[in-house]
Amino acid sequence: MEKALSLEELLAEYREETEEIVEAILEDGSNPDAVYMIEHHLSCTDFDVLEKAAIACFKKGYEVTDPEECELEDGSIILSFDVTVEMNLDEEAIMEDIEKLVVLAQSFSIDYDGWGTYPEE
């Protein structure tokens, strides 16, 4: 059985991942000064818990998407929603949101599944 990562270890992994994502986006020629739609992904298998987490995110001032069903590679179904933030591609600002959302996700026993965005010209 894998040992669960501490919050500090988890955030260190997300920091490294964030640096890699931002670097890859900029290397692909995206505009470093553009405003990006950052999508943070949260999920679990219990709709009621997911809904409560989405409401908590909304109350903290975040925009949230409607919940969706997602089928995983093994055929199991999870429920997810995104927290969306329009911002520059600023690693520190992204990490601030990641830290807040990871802590919130842990408080509801749901998963923070990382973030993504789309290239901007």
UniProtKB/Swiss-Prot annotation:
Q: Name one GO molecular function term.
A: enzyme binding
Entry keyword annotation includes Magnesium = no
Give the matching Pfam families. RraB
Record carries keyword Amino-acid biosynthesis = no
> InterPro entries annotated for this entry?
RraB (IPR016716), RraB-like_sf (IPR036701), RraB_dom (IPR009671)
Query: Which GO cellular component terms are attached?
Result: cytoplasm
Locations listed in the record: Cytoplasm
Q: Which UniProt keywords apply?
A: Cytoplasm
HAMAP family per record: RraB
Q: What does this protein do?
A: Globally modulates RNA abundance by binding to RNase E (Rne) and regulating its endonucleolytic activity. Can modulate Rne action in a substrate-dependent manner by altering the composition of the degradosome.
> Self-association or partners: how does it assemble?
Interacts with the C-terminal region of Rne.
Its family? Belongs to the RraB family.
The identity of this protein, by name, is Regulator of ribonuclease activity B
Protein source organism: Psychromonas ingrahamii (strain DSM 17664 / CCUG 51855 / 37)
